[in-house]
Structures are given as C-alpha cells and as structure tokens.
C-alpha cells in the first residue's frame, strides 16, 4: 500500500474537500434527505452476490459519495487492489504477498507468487483436507481403541480460533456427520478444562493450529491436552488423536504427530484471513467438503465483485469509504455490527480482529506518523438481545455510532409466535426493520406532544434520529452467504488501509506483550524477585504472589 509521502494525506485536495463538505452535512437530517429525493433508496442500494445492501440511511448525499470516490481514486485504491490480487508484496513491513483471495480461486485459475504456482498448492491442500475429513466423517478414521471420532477439539488462538469458531457457530446446522466441535484458545486453564469435561478420550481428536508450532497459548494447551489423552489411552494413542495445521514439521513430529497428518499453509495468508485455508480443517470436518467449498465459493463471489464492479456500485469500496467518512471526518469512534441471527453470535468478535488488528496502526507504510484517526472499533451483539442492552445509547446517546444491520429472509429455525399463527422469524425481522427506521428518522417533540405526553417527559421521549446505518439482507444464512459476508468486510478493511496509507496486514503491536510476558514469568511464578524496571508492575507482582500463596 502507498502512503502519501510528498504531501500529507490530510492536506490533499480530496481530503480538504471532504472536510468542507462535512460541515454542510452537519446542517442535514435524514428526514429531509429522504423527503427531498424520491429516488434515494434506489440510488444508495447495491447488490453483491446474494447480498442486498441498502446504505440510504447514511449521512451522505450524492456529492458525498462523489467526494469519497475521488479520495479513493487519489490514493489509487483500484491499483492497490489489483496489486494485492496479483500477488505483489503489499505487506511491506514483512515483505510478503497478501493472497487470502487465492484460497478461494477455482482450480483452473492461474496465479504464481515468486515463481510458485500457488493455485496448485491451494487445491492440493484442499484435496488433502477433503480426503482426511471424509475418512473422519464416515468412520474410516478411528481412534486408538477403534472408536469413531465424535468430537473434534480445535486448539489455536487469534485467527486460528476466531474464524473457525465463528464459522462453525454460524453453520452448525450443516454439521451432518455426528461430529461436534469444541474450541480451546485461552491460556486460562478453565478454557481447556471446560472443553474437555464430559469427553471420551477414545472418541476425541485434537487439531493443533499454529504456523510455527511455538505459539505459547496453543502449545501450552496442546501439551495439557496431550497429557489428558495419554493418561487415559497411553503414549501410542497420540498419532490417532492429534493432527496439526502448521508449517514447522520438526516440532510437530517431536510432539508425536505423524508427518502425513500435518496440514500446511503459507506466509501470504494472515491469521485473521485464514479460515478458508487449512485453519478451517475443523469446520470441514463438521460440515463436510462440499459445504466448505460453498463457503469458499461465497468468498470468491465477493472477490470478483470487488475486482470488477465499477466504483459507484462496488459494495466493499463504498462501505469501506463510508467507514473512512465516519472515522476521519464525522468523529465516530466505533461501528456497531448487529446481526439479527443468533447463528452469527460470534461474527462481531470475528470482525473485531479483522478490522482492529488490521487497521489499528499509527504510522504510514513509510514510517511517518498518521495525522488522522484510523481503525474502526467494531462491537455488537445479535438482535434482539442488543435492543435490551445498548440500543439506548445508539438512539439517544451523545456518541455517533454507525450501525450495520444484517438479516436473512429465511430462518434456519422458525417457530410460531404466542398466537400460534405467526412466525417468530417475521417478528424478529419486524424488529430488525424498526430499529434502523427509528435510528434514521426518530420521533420529534411535536409528534410526541401530539400523543398527549406529559410536558415533563417530552424531552426524555424525543428520538433525534439522524443515526446512520447500513442494512444487509440475504435470502438465508448458508455457507455461500457467510463467505460473501466475510469477504465483504475483508475488502472494506483493505480499502480503508489504502486510504489511510497503512499496512493492514502486519500486527507488530501484539509482539512486545508476548516478549514481556516471557520475561516476567519467572517473577510471577516466584522463581525470581520482581525487577521489571517499573515500580507499578513490581508491586503488582508482589501483591499477586501474596494473594496466590496467603
């Protein structure tokens, strides 16, 4: 990605024009914008794959969109997009290509990186995953005692956990082979203990996911899980109950995992973009090769849309630029992600890593400091739970929080309402539409007074509206539509990184804490006196030791 070096980004003409235009928008209200433009909904609605995306309830006009696209052109978003898709080393701080999009290319595609045909590599790995998971699902792969595997425990952290957890939770209705998944990520021993409780070691398979096979949390949990298994079944059982997703064969072999049970991936796939790689092995075990392929096809649908759609109808480009609009020009610090599907309960957490680890940067790619806010803070809960938790702030609070509403026309599980004649899903979606409507248009003092409300209560009941939101509708939550949703957000993050001139594909900010934790471990364990170099940490460690061993 290219940072603006000759001229500060915030001093460029497109940026300054948007700053001036933002002052004009201050004088606008969505009520007036809709009233003055009967074509507004059609003008600000796009389709990408199976996703119907209405962004008409945003604090924008046609002029806003024009200026945002001018800014995108000025930093060459399209050229940077093409560089990414062609395998150029756009991750400049690590000198790597960024090719999560290659994970979902069809078999007959052609793409080489550094002289290597990576499409062939990808499909060889997918084939190996498919063969393995088919054996697991149909019972040809048996545990050490001859039992069929009924539980797969994925041990990983970060992208090796958040993606598989989210996808499995979203698509568990497609798990049709009697295999359930559990996920262990946290260094807190309660995580592993809770997930092992009630399991039969003879019917349990562990997938250890770590690129280097040295990640502290993952290897600590994997070692504890190994002890649990060996205590029940003996040392020889390890090869039948552990497989690895890693690129480091030697420590994997030393752990006791057979070479043929190692599934590799590549340094051009970042962890937070890796669920379509062998990192998704546990998901494929649950839902099967065919459904996993549908997930990849969904990703590819949006990849192609992003690559080919013109700017005015390019959903990831438009939504990414809206994120820039609110973050850099409108003072918004966060975005609420509100899936009206309980199956997407982990989707906001997944997006937190995707956007915050990618764009939580304060220097440009050339090392110069960024002069504007970067990195949207994502948060949210499924509807209607969120309505009874934090929607009060969205409707009447002082903070500007753009929201994404995600809903589906068909439910994976529908039940009748209290009357026995209606649909619970229809009632859920009535709430879905109502919330975005009230956020946008609110309720005026005059409208409340007309209802004979107490004069003292009128100010408390006023709903100001003018709160922006995107509505994303799809026919049904399927592997394909889930892949489309994920890719829609992936490419938004990319667009924003290009505009801000930052490297969206490194994560140096997480490294120092790991180093410091290892340095502090002896003092925390009581093997050395606290001498960390700062008095607060030393005092806290001493207090911890006193409380731990009273």
From Swiss-Prot:
It is found in: Cytoplasm. GO terms for molecular function: carbohydrate derivative binding; glucose-6-phosphate isomerase activity; monosaccharide binding. Pathway: Carbohydrate biosynthesis; gluconeogenesis; Carbohydrate degradation; glycolysis; D-glyceraldehyde 3-phosphate and glycerone phosphate from D-glucose: step 2/4. The keyword Ligase does not apply. GO terms for cellular component: cytosol. Signal peptide: none annotated. Keywords: Cytoplasm, Gluconeogenesis, Glycolysis, Isomerase, Plasmid. It is an enzyme of class 5 (isomerase). Its EC number is 5.3.1.9. The active site is at residues 357, 388, 514. Coiled coil: none annotated. It catalyses: alpha-D-glucose 6-phosphate = beta-D-fructose 6-phosphate. It holds the Pfam family PGI. GO terms for biological process: gluconeogenesis; glucose 6-phosphate metabolic process; glycolytic process. The keyword Isomerase applies. Catalyzes the reversible isomerization of glucose-6-phosphate to fructose-6-phosphate. Belongs to the GPI family. This is Glucose-6-phosphate isomerase 3. It comes from Rhodococcus jostii (strain RHA1). The gene is pgi3.
